From Swiss-Prot:
Component of the spliceosome B complex. Interacts with PRPF38A (via N-terminal interaction domain). This is Microfibrillar-associated protein 1. InterPro entries: MFAP1 (IPR033194), MFAP1_C (IPR009730). There is a cross-link at residues 67, 249, 357, 371, 381, 415, 418 (Glycyl lysine isopeptide (Lys-Gly) (interchain with G-Cter in SUMO2)).
Length: 439
């Protein structure tokens, strides 16, 4: 409930009055003295209840906010009127204005419908603030104090009369508040709905309602998905059982074959003497083979050592007398004109094989034809294809790239060709194995 504007416009009470209006159990309001108690940190105030419900907590928070809203303007007003002389001047001016207005016209005081507990507590708080400024009011003369006390008593009486009227109004509306509090939320929503424009309700048949159709379609779709999931799970289960069954059959068949092989193995008629003689033969062959390999290795080492001890002339004579033996040496054939060459590779072979001694230079496929009778332009490899060659042979072609750095005529290139380049110097001596020092 808002505070009347007329009461807000009244000047603050600057006196040492220490009484506040208090309502008793019968609803009567009387003035009682206020006993200022010292604040103790962590101690519960006397006015605070021992236990409170959620509604009381909300009401306490609302009262606290109202106190803060009322305290802000009064703090500003008190700060602005900290000077006693300025305060007296303001009070005198306001009183003169009120008296002048009262002489000219009758002021109609607004009717107070009700006063909340926060307002009563706000008045008590203001009076406590006024008591705290008692030391500053010692400079005011006695006549001013008496006049202000009279005004305070008059205003307190008027406030008491107004509160009595408010109590009567509250008693009449108290019976209806209980029923209103139960349906507070519904009335609040109804009040919001009243602000919006109302539309005429139109009946829609159940089968035409979109929401029902969508819900039924969604339920049907969900049911189909569940059935599909069940079907897939059943198929996976059957497939797994089939795989397990096949694996089991394979294991059983393998076990049967193993048992049959063991049954077929009959060692009753074996002769231990024959087995022993066969083992002795195998061991003798192995010993002989190991001895031969060892003797061959020793002979090879002795031959290498002998060749190392020979002089250069003796080594050359030895190599001429005993040429190098090439294993699987093939016959070197003659290739035809533009015949394709197939490289057979080079691998180490310590044993002679007839298949490696064949003539691999024999022509195949298109190489059987005589390509010397073809025109000059067709005497290239892969003629008419993407992989054809540019020249028939490179013997009669100059492939020098004159755009490269080597083809440029410079002092550095000339010096290199004359001193170090091979095949371009006027030297016709046979090169020796050792590099000669050039000065």
């Amino acid at each position: 409930m808002s505070v009347p504007s007329a009461l807000m416009k009244q000047p603050p009470i600057q006196s040492t009055a220490g009484a506040v209006p208090v309502r008793n159990e019968k609803g009567e309001i009387s003035m009682e003295k206020v006993k200022v108690k010292r604040y103790v940190s962590g101690k519960r105030p006397d006015y605070a209840p021992m236990e409170s419900s959620d509604e009381e907590d909300e009401e306490f928070q609302f009262i606290k906010k109202a106190k803060e809203q009322e305290a802000e303007p009064e703090e500003q007003e008190e700060d602005s009127s900290s000077d006693p002389r300025l305060r007296r001047l303001q009070n005198r001016i306001s009183e003169d204005v009120e008296e002048r207005l009262a002489r000219h016209r009758k002021i109609v005081e607004p009717e107070v419908v009700g006063e909340s507990d926060s307002e009563v507590e706000g008045d008590a708080w203001r009076m406590e603030r006024e008591d705290s400024s008692e030391e500053e009011e010692e400079e005011i003369d006695d006549e001013e104090i008496e006049r202000r006390r009279g005004m305070m008593r008059q205003r307190a009486q008027e406030r008491k009369n107004e509160e009595m009227e408010v109590m009567e109004v509250e008693d009449e509306g108290r019976s209806g508040e209980e029923s209103e509090s139960e349906s507070e939320y519904e009335e609040y929503t109804d009040s919001e709905d009243e602000m919006e424009p109302r539309l005429k309700p139109v009946f829609i048949r159940k089968k035409d309602r979109v929401t029902v159709q969508e819900r039924e379609a969604e339920a049907l779709k969900q049911k189909e998905l569940e059935q599909e999931a069940k079907r897939m799970a059943e198929e996976r289960r059957k497939y797994t059982l089939k795989i397990v069954e096949e694996e089991t059959k394979k294991e059983l068949e393998e076990n049967k074959r193993s048992l049959a092989a063991l049954d077929a193995l009959n060692t009753d008629d074996e002769n231990d003497e024959e087995e022993y003689e066969a083992w002795k033969v195998r061991e003798l062959k192995r010993i002989k083979r190991d001895r031969e390999d060892r003797e061959a290795l020793e002979k090879e080492k002795a031959e290498i050592e002998r060749m190392r001890n020979l002089t250069e002339e003796e080594r050359r004579a030895e190599l001429r007398a005993n040429g190098k033996v090439i294993t699987n040496k093939a016959v070197k054939g003659k290739y035809k004109f533009l015949q394709k060459y197939y490289h057979r590779g080079a691998f180490f072979m310590d044993e002679d094989e007839e298949v490696y001694k064949r003539d691999f230079s024999a022509p195949t496929l298109e190489d059987h034809f005589n390509k010397t009778i073809l025109p000059k332009v067709m005497q290239v490899k892969n003629f008419g294809r993407s992989g054809r060659t540019k020249y028939t042979h490179l013997v009669d072609q100059d492939t020098t790239s004159f755009d490269s750095a080597w083809g440029q005529e410079s002092a550095q290139n000339t010096k290199f060709f004359k001193q170090k380049a091979a095949g371009v110097r006027d030297v016709f001596e046979r090169p020796s194995a050792k590099k000669r020092k050039t000065t």
